[in-house]
C-alpha cells in the first residue's frame, strides 16, 4: 500500500497493523492520545453528566510498542507528542528511545468532580519527544502550561467520547510543532479532532481509530468539516 493511499483519511483499523505498513521516516509529527489505564465509571453530578473512561481498551495498556513503532516512522527533524495522565507518566518518562524534550501540562478549569477522597484532576500531560532539528514555531508557544477547558462532548452532544480533546488545544500543538503540508500521524484518533484540525491548518494526516462506532462518527465529522470549508 502506498502512503498516499492513507493520507487525509481516518482509517478503521488497529493502529499497529497500519504502522507496520508505513515506511521508515515518513511522518513529520506524531500527535496522539492513547489509552490512559485510568478506567472508571461515568458519574452524574447535579445537572451535569461527566463521562469518564470505562472500557477494556483502557486497561493494561502498554505504550512502549507504540512508541517504538512511531519512532521508526518518524522523520529526522520530527517530534512525537503523547497525551497521558499520571497513571502512565512514569512509563513515558523512562522510555529512552528518543530525546525527552519536555512535558507539557494541559490544565483545564472545568474538571469533573472527584469520585473518591482525592483532589479533582485538572491536569493532563503531553510528553514531547524530538529528533534533532525539530520544528518549533516559537511564536505560537509561550510556556509549557496550556490553559484550555476540557471538552466532554463535541458537535453539541451528538458525539460522546470519554477522552475528547478540544480543537483549540490540538490546533495549538499543530501550529507549534508542525508546518503546512507536514504529515501528521494520530494512532488513536477517537472523535477525529486531529483530522479536522489538520484539515483547517493545511496539514496532511493519517488518523487511525479501532472502534467502528467512533470511527464512523468521526468520518462524518470530517465530511461535514470538508463540506463547510468548501463553502468559503
Segments the model singles out, each with a brief description of its role:
Residues 1-216:
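Core catalytic lobe of class I
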Residues 1-5, 219-232:
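Short, conserved SAM-binding/catalytic segment
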Amino acid at each position: 500500500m502506498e502512503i498516499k493511499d492513507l493520507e487525509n483519511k481516518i482509517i478503521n483499523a488497529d493502529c499497529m497493523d497500519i504502522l507496520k505498513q508505513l515506511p521508515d521516516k515518513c511522518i513529520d509529527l506524531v500527535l496522539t492520545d492513547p489509552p490512559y489505564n485510568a478506567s472508571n465509571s461515568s458519574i452524574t453530578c447535579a445537572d451535569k453528566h461527566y463521562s469518564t473512561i470505562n472500557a477494556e481498551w483502557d486497561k493494561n495498556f502498554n505504550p512502549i510498542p507504540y512508541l517504538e513503532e512511531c519512532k521508526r516512522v518518524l522523520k529526522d527533524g520530527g517530534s512525537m507528542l503523547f497525551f497521558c495522565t499520571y497513571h502512565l507518566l512514569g512509563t513515558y518518562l523512562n522510555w529512552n528511545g528518543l530525546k525527552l524534550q519536555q512535558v507539557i501540562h494541559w490544565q483545564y478549569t472545568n474538571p469533573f468532580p472527584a469520585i473518591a477522597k482525592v483532589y479533582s484532576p485538572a491536569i493532563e500531560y503531553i510528553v514531547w519527544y524530538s529528533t534533532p532539528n525539530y520544528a518549533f514555531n516559537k511564536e505560537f508557544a509561550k510556556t509549557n502550561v496550556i490553559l484550555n477547558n476540557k471538552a466532554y462532548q463535541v458537535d453539541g452532544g451528538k458525539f460522546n467520547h470519554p477522552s475528547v480533546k478540544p480543537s483549540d488545544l490540538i490546533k495549538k500543538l499543530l501550529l507549534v510543532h508542525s508546518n503546512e503540508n507536514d504529515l501528521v500521524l494520530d494512532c488513536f484518533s477517537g472523535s477525529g479532532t486531529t483530522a479536522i484540525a489538520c484539515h483547517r491548518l493545511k496539514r496532511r494526516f493519517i488518523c487511525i481509530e479501532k472502534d467502528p462506532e467512533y470511527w464512523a462518527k468521526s468520518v462524518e465529522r470530517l465530511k461535514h468539516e470538508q463540506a463547510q470549508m468548501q463553502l468559503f
